[in-house]
Structure formats: C-alpha cells, structure tokens
Swiss-Prot record:
Protein name: Chromatin structure-remodeling complex protein RSC6
Region (Disordered): 142-183, 273-309
Subcellular location: Nucleus
Organism per entry: Saccharomyces cerevisiae (strain ATCC 204508 / S288c) (Baker's yeast)
The keyword Nucleus appears for this protein: yes
Length: 483
C-alpha cells in the first residue's frame, strides 16, 4: 500500500545536500561550504563519542566531595554601654537623673578577609526589639501563697515524705512566681527594622539609646536573609533519622532513600518470595497451635494479610514513626511527598537580654554564632548573561541566513541541471517537461478535472481483472483520503 510520508526536517543548515554535478568554479564559495559540512560532521562525531563516554563513566563515579566547603560563621554581639550611672563600676560621681544606656546589636563574619568585607545588614531580613517591664502589683491584689505561708500548719506526715513534700512546695512556688512574672510583663517600647530592596542600607550594627536608671529586660528577634527553602528545619523524628537538625529537602529525601536501600526495604521479587515463605511458615505454625480451637478462632487465623506490591517500600518501626503513619508499606512517591510535610522554614533567632546598668559595658558577655553558608553561597547573577543572550541572538540570525542561502543554492542547482540537460538534449528535455507539467496540473486540479459522466464511462471497472491495477487505484484513493 502506498502511504504518504512527511519530509525529513533539516535540523542544521549544514545538513543540506550539495549535488555532485555542481561545478566548483561556477558557484562561489562552494568549496568552503563543503569544508564546513565536513567539519560539522567531524564535530558531531566527536560530541557523540564524548557523550557516550560520559554516560558510561558517570554512574560509576559516585564518590562525593572529600572536602566540603567550610562553614561561614557570623558572630552576633549583644551588649549595652552605660553613661552617668551611679551604680556603674567606674567610680566617678554621676547624676541618676541623667543616666543613659545604649543597646548595640552588631555582627561580624569570622575569618573574613579585608578585601571581601560583608556588612551585618547583608545577612538580615529583619530585626525587632521589645523592651519589657513588670507591671506594678495592685494594693488589693495579694499572692495566693502568702496566705498559706502565714498559717502554721502542723500536719503529721510520714518521715520519708517530708523532703518530697517540701521540694514539691518549692517547685510549685517557683513555677507560680515565673508564670506570674511573665503575665505581669508589658512592652514599654519597641523597635523594628526590615530590609527594603528599594532602599538598601548597609550597617555593621544597630544602636538603641534610651534614658533610664533601672535594669530593663528586652526580647531581640533576628530574622536571617535567604530563608527560601534551600535550608529548612527538620522535624524531631526526621532529625533523629538523618542526624542533623537543619538541611535541604533534597538531603532529607536522599537520606531516607539511602536508609531504605541499606535496610533492604524495597519490595522486589526476591523479598516478596521470602515474605511469602515466611508467611506460609507462620500460618502453618499458627494452624498447628490452633488445631483444637473453635470455628471462630479458625476463621480469624485464616484471614489473609495485605501483601505489598512490587515497587513499594516496607515501613519499619522507625520509618513509621518518622512518617507518622501506621501503614506497613507505602509507594515510594508517597514517601517522597510526605517529606515536604516534615520540614518547616528556619525559625527566627530570639534572644532574651537584660540591660545591666551596673557596668560601663557588657561587651562579650552575650554572643551567638550562626551558620550563614547558605546565604553567602547563593548563586549570583552572572554579569555576562546579557552579552551571552545577545551573542545567541546573533548566532540565530546567522543560522537563518545560512538556511536561506542553502535554499537558494538548491534552487539554483535545479535550474542549472534543467538548462544543462536542455543544452544537451533539447527535444527530450522539453517533452519530459511538458509531460511533468501536465501531470502536476492533473494533481493540482484533483476532482475538478473529472466530471460525473467521465467517471461513469471510465474503463476502470472493465479492467477489474487486473488485480495489480485495481490495488494501485485503491491505494491511490486511500493515500488521498478519498476512501
């Protein structure tokens, strides 16, 4: 059967076919085009060979990096300085009404070179400081424990319970005191700074200056920049399995996958056969043990178990605890999708600090080291990306021009072949040209060339004895979509 096929698309301009009868001296730069096609074929052969070598060697090269990149640590200092405080250790006389203090929050990158200095604001997304103070107790408000302490209760208790009861009373009193203190705290002042990409400000520290003569508690909240999912916090059960509190989602998925491989938890034909034999032995043992049991017990013992399918993962006790499920087996894709529910964004850093006015400065008393490798090692936009895009656009325009020139060359080759044949055999060439033009006209006209009477009086039905002719006509109708 004759079927119509689509022409093979030309992927590259150099894939164009150059007729052998074209003379090099008549077509300009034809020799250069042949050299270009030959060089292109060599380049394709080399790239194919290198691609095969890479595909063969890549699976065997599973060795990870021996020396991971060093962690970049940011040290955060929180301290206060005091001026004109009568309780300071400077020994100079001061006026209590003019006592001022300054709270400073600054950060420095450890092991930082002088050339590549990073300001503290580069690592921050926002900073909030809440100053808290205890509310004064009301005159009629009394503590519950005071009334109980004022009554001498002489209760006789066993000797071995005296110590325990005393410790319990003290603990309850401390809990009540802490809960009462937290409930009495009120925010007397607050300060907040957030990063604004339209108004970028660089600084190495934040100074907050206030006037006061009493110690003051404050809560400092620091939100680091770069919390975009590259580094997340794991759930407690997932952190127990992986051995790290934070990391990426890809690391968590890879760790679970390695745990499944090491413990042979994939359901394969071999493991399924082993499980089937173990189940058969267990069922036979149960039947032997329950040989004299009643009918109801026999029905319960013969209930078939839900067996896992091929490609699923058998969940042991640790995986069931990590994934928070009671299922005995799950598909691998469900295990991967469940990992997204076990991670959360990195929480902000919260520090409780007390401004101490008894010292001139508390520098170095409160420090915190934070890993900022995920912020410094983020991929930066390439400065030459725009130039590369412009170069790609120029290359695309040149490829289009080469394609157009190749089409013009093929058209000129057909004209050259026609006139060359016409100069050698003019009569035969013109006769063949008229016949091919007539055939093309019939093809273009299609059904318009034939009318109904001509189709009825045609001898196509009288020559039905010729099977080859009949099959050819049917194939032609099928190829044109007319049947």
């Amino acid at each position: 059967m004759v079927t119509q096929t689509n022409p093979v698309p030309v992927t590259y301009p150099t894939d164009a076919y150059i007729p052998t009868y074209l003379p090099d001296d008549k077509v300009s730069n034809l020799a250069d085009l042949k050299k270009l096609i030959e060089m292109d074929s060599r380049l394709d052969l080399y790239l194919t060979r290198r691609r095969l070598d890479t595909s063969i060697n890549l699976p065997t090269n599973t060795k990870t990096k021996d020396h991971p990149p060093n962690k970049e640590m940011l040290r955060i200092y929180v301290y206060n300085t005091t001026e004109s405080s009568p309780r300071s250790d400077s020994g100079t006389p001061a006026d209590s009404g003019k006592t001022t203090w300054t709270l400073r929050i600054e950060g420095k990158l450890l092991h930082e070179s002088a050339n590549g200095k990073h300001p503290f604001s580069e690592f921050l997304e926002g900073v909030a400081v809440d100053f808290k103070r205890l509310k004064p107790l009301g005159m009629g408000k009394k503590r519950k424990r005071d009334s109980s302490l004022s009554l001498p209760l002489n209760l006789q208790q066993p000797e071995y319970n005296d110590q325990d009861s005393t410790m319990g009373d003290n603990d309850n009193g401390e809990d009540e005191d802490s809960a009462e203190a937290e409930s009495r705290e009120e925010i007397v002042d607050a300060l907040e700074w957030n990063y604004d990409e339209n108004n970028v400000v660089e600084f190495d520290g934040i100074d907050i200056k206030r006037q006061g003569k009493d110690n003051l508690r404050c809560s400092i909240t620091i939100q680091l920049r770069g919390v975009d999912g590259g580094k997340v916090q794991y759930s407690p059960n997932l952190a127990t399995l992986i051995g790290m509190q934070t990391g990426s989602v890809n690391d968590a998925v890879y760790s679970i996958y390695k745990y499944i491989l090491i413990n042979n938890l994939f359901v394969t034909e071999q493991t399924e056969a082993q499980d089937g034999s173990n189940d058969a032995e267990d069922s036979s043992n149960e039947n032997n043990n329950k040989n004299g049991a009643g009918d109801d017990d026999g029905v319960e013992g013969s209930t078939p178990k839900d067996k896992p399918e091929l490609g699923e993962v058998k969940l042991d006790s640790l995986l069931q605890k990590v994934l928070d499920t009671n299922a005995a087996h799950l598909p691998l894709m469900n295990v991967v999708q469940t990992v997204n529910k076990l991670v959360s964004p990195l929480p902000p850093i919260i520090l409780d600090y007390t401004i101490d006015l008894s010292k001139d400065t508390t520098y170095g008393a409160t420090t915190l080291d934070v890993d900022v490798s995920h912020i410094l090692h983020q991929p930066q936009p390439q400065p030459n990306l725009q130039k590369e895009e412009e170069t790609d656009a120029e290359d695309t325009a040149k490829l289009r021009e080469i394609t157009k020139l190749a089409l013009q060359l093929n058209s000129s080759a057909q004209k050259y072949q026609f006139f060359h044949e016409l100069s050698l055999h003019p009569r035969e060439t013109l006769t063949h040209y008229l016949w091919s033009s007539k055939q093309n006209e019939l093809v273009l006209q299609g059904d318009q060339y034939f009318n109904e009477d001509a189709a009825r009086t045609s001898d196509i039905y009288s020559n039905n004895n010729n099977d080859r002719s009949l099959m050819g006509n049917i194939s032609l109708l099928y190829s044109q979509g007319r049947l």
